[in-house]
Amino acid sequence: MSDLDSSSSSAYPKYLEHLSGDGKAIGVLTSGGDAQGMNAAVRAVVRMGIYTGAKVYFIYEGYQGLVDGGSNIVEAKWDCVSSILQVGGTIIGSARCKAFRSREGRLKAACNLARLGITNLCVIGGDGSLTGANLFRKEWSGLLEELARNGDIDNDTVQKYSYLNVVGMVGSIDNDFCGTDMTIGTDSALHRIIEVVDAIMTTAQSHQRTFVLEVMGRHCGYLALVSALTCGADWVFLPESPPEEDWEENMCLKLSENRARKKRLNIIIVSEGAIDMQNKPITSEKIKELVVKNLGFDTRVTILGHVQRGGTPSAFDRILASRMGVEAVIALLEATPETPACVVSLRGNQAVRLPLMECVQMTQDVQKAMDERRFKEAVKLRGRRFEGNLNTYKRLAIKLPDEKIVKSNCNVAVINVGAPAAGMNAAVRSAVRVGIADGHKMFAIYDGFEGFANGQIKEIGWADVGGWTGQGGSILGTKRTLPGKYLEKIAEQMHSHSINALLIIGGFEAYLGLLELAAAREKHEAFCVPMVMVPATVSNNVPGSDFSIGADTALNTITDTCDRIKQSASGTKRRVFIIETMGGYCGYLANMGALAAGADAAYIFEEPFDIGDLQSNVVHLTEKMKTSIQRGLVLRNESCSVNYTTDFIYQLYSEEGKGVFDCRKNVLGHMQQGGAPSPFDRNFGTKISAKAMEWISAKLKGSQGTGKKFVSDDSICVLGICKRDLLFQPVAELKKVTDFEHRIPKEQWWLKLRPIMKILAKYEASYDMSDSGKLESLQHHEEL
């Protein structure tokens, strides 16, 4: 396939020169607690390092291996990291090391590295591991001079390896490191928690039980908070935000109110480091005793423990770790003696580099604030995302009494449009509850625009959407029908129900529908109200947003299926599988699925390919069969080519590979739209929908009873995530950046990740580094 030169933000794209790491050596180690996705990071560092011409060394058993040296430091080969993407934990081991804390231990470590010429260190671990690496870097020249004085190394070695470069990647399920949106392993840990919560819900409902779930996280409440948000928990206990003094009474009142509303189960989530206002621990057993004593509810405690560290990494963690690994190698190759140690981090969908010690300092400041009971400051220091999650949870979990809600006298309708996508129901629940909290009357429209025209609309209450977060598909019902032929009837329904604003949750059809409603404003006054669309489609093809609700769940389905298929191919030997994914003309699922599953190739519409490309892929796979990895995996987007169909590619591979490998095909189909939503989709759907309702409330404020008509472009928008921010973009502006024929945006951010997929599959590719991390200050990073 031809390499895609993605458009760059700078005037001149900056490409990674092949073999720019020639003569350099990189050591990679994992330290501290293990986390799912560490292996994906190790794989990316090894393969990107080898691709650039550098030597890469495994350092086994973390810092202990660094101190012990010998067989603990081994050169890594390309094939060493095959088949590890789907494995949890870390294949190179991790251990706590007292020896490295002493200068004597670090002296041994420096000697081991200098003798092998390793002057680039990639550390995957938590804040303690990264702090140790930075100290080692600072002491490096002094350590080498001492080794030379002791006669362990010669003076030439001191001169040649005079400085050590250090780059960190944060591998921790706790997500407790300041400066990064997500640490490697957090998303997978959330998958484990949500799997347990979903399983517990059925047994709790059968018996009308209360469950107290204790999750990990040490002194960081991220896992507990997001779990509570994604499963609609009744109560959550966090170290950063202890409950008020009379929390026992308030919690029992909330639980009994929910039970009185016919809710058959209560879920309380407790972070293992939960404390009260006096910094005294709140344990799951204490909560159970309280509920049993005060309410007499049948209550059970489940401590999830190390289950959260285990299992297969999620698609998100594999992609995150692969991107971070590639970025870490580039950062090491670009480093100079003056460059401070950095940590590669994620902000929105962008890889950034941040000064390591600034991040460590801020992480320690959070703990200090908690120790000194400055809890509001601790929440702020955790970052915008944590604070946003906490505020959203509070709004959705606790309903004020009706008499305390200030009525807006506005009616807001919610509608699902397009194909079903996992997470739609979480978005509807969030919209309904935020709308009610803002004093609006909320209306649900059933079966899309067709149902709207037929009057399938009714008021929906707070309790009506209870338990919707974990439900897949669309409970309201959704259709691809556009509003065009029903405009008169829809306008009548808007008028008769006095609808003052409309929230549309859906895919490309929802976007087209919004454009049709915008065009009909001149003719129909009923459409002169604020309208906003939240993207929800597995295809991730809505202009104005880098991600859409449902795409992450579909990606996990593809990744899980590919893992099983790869296992089948490994057992059979010399077999290549062709997998067809959904997405219409958008290659997001095929490309990102290939990156997450470790595929050999992905055919997508956005990057035209010809018979020559197909033949070169066959040659590549033929060469691969001569190695120890005797299997192949190729993904194909369903609409990537009119003539090069899945059947055609299957037949071509079968014929050309005759005698070397055999071939099988698999069309994944509608299984990609189904299943329970992933934690990411539940959380994203909840937050983006809440943000959309805040926008509607702000627009409606003060307009009721004034007869104000909303006719400006900025009153009909798409809300999407763009790079680092949630943005409202008028559909009138988005028209310019839309390829209507193929139903995709004209520019797509993920195409820049395409070379990563190729490089990790052993192809040569032009990797555009224009967006590669410039070292940012943490303060600037937090303000964005």
From Swiss-Prot:
Binding of substrate occurs at: S172, I173, D174, R209, M216, G217, R218, E272, R300, H306, V307, Q308, R309
Q: Supply one GO molecular-function term.
A: ATP binding
Activity regulation, in the record's words, is: Allosterically activated by ADP, AMP, or fructose 2,6-bisphosphate, and allosterically inhibited by ATP or citrate.
What does the UniProt keyword field contain? Acetylation, Allosteric enzyme, ATP-binding, Cytoplasm, Glycolysis, Glycoprotein, Kinase, Magnesium, Metal-binding, Nucleotide-binding, Phosphoprotein, Transferase
Residue numbers spanned by region C-terminal regulatory PFK domain 2? 411-784
UniProt region (Interdomain linker), positions on chain: 399-410
List the InterPro entries.
6-Pfructokinase_euk, ATP_PFK, PFK_vert-type, Phosphofructokinase_CS, Phosphofructokinase_dom, PKF_sf
Q: Which residues carry this modification: N6-acetyllysine?
A: K394, K485, K687
Q: Which residues carry this modification: Phosphotyrosine?
A: Y650
Q: Where does beta-D-fructose 2,6-bisphosphate bind?
A: 480, 537-541, 575, 582-584, 638, 664, 670-673, 743
Per UniProt, where does ATP bind?
Answer: G33, R96, C97, G126, D127, G128, S129
Which PROSITE patterns does this one have?
Answer: PHOSPHOFRUCTOKINASE (PS00433)
Tissues in which the UniProt entry reports expression: Expression is constant during tumor growth and markedly decreases when cell proliferation stops.
Cite the post-translational modification comment: GlcNAcylation decreases enzyme activity.
> Where is the segment annotated N-terminal catalytic PFK domain 1?
1-398
Compartments in which it is found:
Cytoplasm
Where are the annotated glycans? S539
Which SUPFAM superfamilies does the entry mention? Phosphofructokinase (SSF53784)
What happens on changing E104V? In strain: NOD
Q: What is the effect of changing S777P?
A: In strain: LG/J and NOD
Task: Give the metabolic or biological pathway.
Answer: Carbohydrate degradation; glycolysis; D-glyceraldehyde 3-phosphate and glycerone phosphate from D-glucose: step 3/4
Task: Kindly report, in one word, the top-level EC class recorded for this enzyme.
Answer: transferase
Role this protein plays? Catalyzes the phosphorylation of D-fructose 6-phosphate to fructose 1,6-bisphosphate by ATP, the first committing step of glycolysis.
What protein am I looking at?
ATP-dependent 6-phosphofructokinase, platelet type
- According to its UniProt entry, this protein's organism is Mus musculus (Mouse)
Gene of this entry = Pfkp
